[in-house]
């Protein structure tokens, strides 16, 4: 998955998707999370497909911190605040002593709430 991770870091999401399809490690929660992230962040996002990959990642690993964070951010894009808050609660349990993913999703939720009247 390293080449795909490098493409994501370079914000070349189309290349990341291509590399992930070649790697075809669909039994890996990390693979599903990276695919979901790349689909969500590409120039023309595909939120419905990204959501399917996040759900698959969480079915494989219910405590996958990256998938919990990124799926929560996707839900905010779909105006599903309650869903994002549920994922934040799951992240809180997955991060025994706090973690970056929890803080990032918490910040995204706060920003989302600040924009709503």
PLM region spans:
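Alpha-helical segment of the N-proximal tetratricopeptide repeat
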Residues: 1-23
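Residue-level recognition of tetratricopeptide repeat
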Residues: 5, 37-39, 73
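Register position in tetratricopeptide repeats
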Residues: 9-10, 41-43, 77, 94, ...
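Structural signature of tandem alpha-helical TPR/SEL1-like repeats
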Residues: 10-15, 43-56, 78-87
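Structural marker of alpha-solenoid helical repeat scaffolds
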Residues: 26, 60, 93-97
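TPR alpha-solenoid repeat register
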Residues: 31-33, 67, 101
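Canonical tetratricopeptide repeat
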Residues: 34-35, 70, 104-108
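Terminal, low-structured helical/coil segments at or just beyond the last alpha-helical repeat
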Residues: 85-117
């Amino acid at each position: 998955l390293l080449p795909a991770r490098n493409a994501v870091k370079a914000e070349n999401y189309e290349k990341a998707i291509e590399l992930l399809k070649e790697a075809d490690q669909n039994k890996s929660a990390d693979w599903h999370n990276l695919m979901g992230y790349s689909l969500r962040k590409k120039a023309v996002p595909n939120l419905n497909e990204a959501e399917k990959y996040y759900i698959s990642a969480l079915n494989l690993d219910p405590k996958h911190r990256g998938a919990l964070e990124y799926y929560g951010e996707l839900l905010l894009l779909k105006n599903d605040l309650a869903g994002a808050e549920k994922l934040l609660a799951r992240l809180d349990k997955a991060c025994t002593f706090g973690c970056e993913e929890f803080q990032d999703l918490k910040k995204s939720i706060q920003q989302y709430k600040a924009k709503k009247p």
